[in-house]
Amino acid sequence: MATALITGASSGLGEVFAHQLAGKGYDLVLTARREGRLVNVASKARQMGAKQVEVIAADLSHRDGPAAIMRELATRGLQIDYLVNNAGFGTSGRFDRLPLERELEEIDLNVAALVALTRLLVPAMVERRSGTIINVASTAGFQAVPYMSTYAATKAFVLSFTEGLAGELVGTGVKILALCPGPVKTEFQSVANNEKSTMPSFVYLDAETVVAQGIAAAANGRMVHIAGIVNFLTAELQRLMPRVLVNQISRRIYRPNADA
């Protein structure tokens, strides 16, 4: 059976990807920093149908993280047919008040690690003329987001990178998708310190819905998928609006209480 590598698999969308792909019969390689959490996710994935589940504890915010994962894959004799670049986090607040080291870690994890793993794994997929890559972007990638400036910029990169690579991979048998969720009910908001944003509750989707839509969109050869009809309509509307107006609206939604 085909094997899927899922980054950021210890919680949130990554955990749900593990469970849903296990239910489809995929063998799994799960990676994240928290090995204990990965072991628990792996146990449930086996119950849901995955015959083989490997756990690799690694920190992809370090530049040597992707290479370490590749070495471990080689040691265990594992071939990756399906890559889910899900690992990432966001920060929120005024940029000039945020710790620089944390902002750089965000860029390394959300961008550099994704590019590295894609570059390291896609040649073998092209050679086999078969493979699937899902890069988890965000609706934040369609416009700048004040108070989440770095995060939105990283997701804009993921979106553009995926679309560009999709053009290069035409005819190779390799499918690549940018999955663009809006707000999702996961621990992301607490990690980003953004639990008190004024985002209306009706735009939030559950992780199971987002992942199911992403898997289906990738299977159908889609290049970009925006999860949720409200998020889709919002993203399309923003294309027609003046950028300064979009910026002002985003500023009001994401502005921390201290800066209100």
List each language-model region with its residue ranges.
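Conserved NAD(P)H cofactor-binding loop of Rossmann-fold oxidoreductase domains
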Residues: 86-91
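Active-site helix of classical SDR
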Residues: 118, 154
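Residue(s) in the substrate-gating loop at a strand-loop-helix junction
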Residues: 138
